[in-house]
Amino acid sequence: MAEGPIDFWFTMGSTYSYLSVMRLADVARTHGVTFRWRPFHLLLILNEMKHVPFADKPAKMDYMWRDIARRAPMYGLRPKLPAPYPARQSVVANLVALAGMGEGWGADFVRAAYRRWFENGEETGSEPNVSSSLRDIGQDPARVLALANSSAMNERLVAETDAAKQLGIFGSPTFVVGREPFWGDDRLEDALNWRKYGRIRP
């Protein structure tokens, strides 16, 4: 068994993270668990691994959208698919999310940005998604973007990405209980079991 929060590692350009982002608050309430939201720059890790994104593999991309379409109704979600992909400015969204985690509104921004990406067709990290998502949650886009684009915030994102790499993380979303990683939205329940029982139960 493990005590304390579950670390929720995600990158804003990840399509499958949409499913986790939009249900995590309900999961936290239902199970009495705290999640620590940890944005990181997955693309840096994938580049080191010479991993080819789904966008360059049509069959995998078709499956991805179908898989999300099948799973979304379980969580009461109605995305308009396919959403714009790949998200070419996801690093901007990651920086804004990281800034928000330090000020207490990060999770709200992430939910708003994913909602606009998957329900309104506004690519995450790009405009109008970023500024509109910030306004949706009562934040000033000019102030936040200045903070997000600062050298200090860029250094923090690199440090968080390094921390993810040290944990062996190679995908988003990943849930970490102690130092035990669970990759994928469909492994969230396994992570909850591991935290409660120290093993996976049926």
Q: Where do the language-model regions lie?
A:
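C-terminal cap of thioredoxin/glutaredoxin-like
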Residues: 3-7, 11-33, 115-202
